[in-house]
């Protein structure tokens, strides 16, 4: 069993994670964890991770005015919850935004600039997604 938490308000989301855990769901992910309507704080992310969920951080447009601030917030949250429960992704590809490969590369570079090691980046961008998908 697996589950994805996306686009659900926080109280219902945590309730679904608890119920998923109780029902034996093995793989869960909270997508866009810091974005509305979920907008989790670090304590809530830690609770979700303890329930077995991965926490996803989505590197959207690196050219937006708030990109640096957003990346700073992501980095602070990841340092607290840990790379072992973190997944990095992008949802770029819309017209007017960078290509997904370019935007994701910029996101990874921004995390390196904020002190994350290559080992951390590999874990969050490759190994953890593979675990979530049951490939590892």
Question: Which positions does each model-derived feature cover?
Answer:
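His/Asp/Glu-enriched short active-site or ligand-binding loop at hydrolase and phosphoryl-transfer sites
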Residues: 52-64
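Mid-to-C-terminal alpha-helical segments outside catalytic/metal-binding sites
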Residues: 103-136
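Short acidic/histidine-rich active-site segments
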Residues: 58, 83-100
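Divalent metal-coordination and catalytic microenvironments
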Residues: 3, 55, 91, 121, ...
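Catalytic alpha/beta core domains of metabolic enzymes, predominantly
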Residues: 64-67, 96
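Histidine/acidic residue-rich metal-binding segments in metalloenzymes
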Residues: 1-29, 37-53, 68-88, 102-114
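Active-site-proximal loop/turn and secondary-structure-junction residues that shape catalytic pockets
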Residues: 7-11, 34-36, 59-61, 92-94
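A generic structural motif
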Residues: 31-36, 122-124
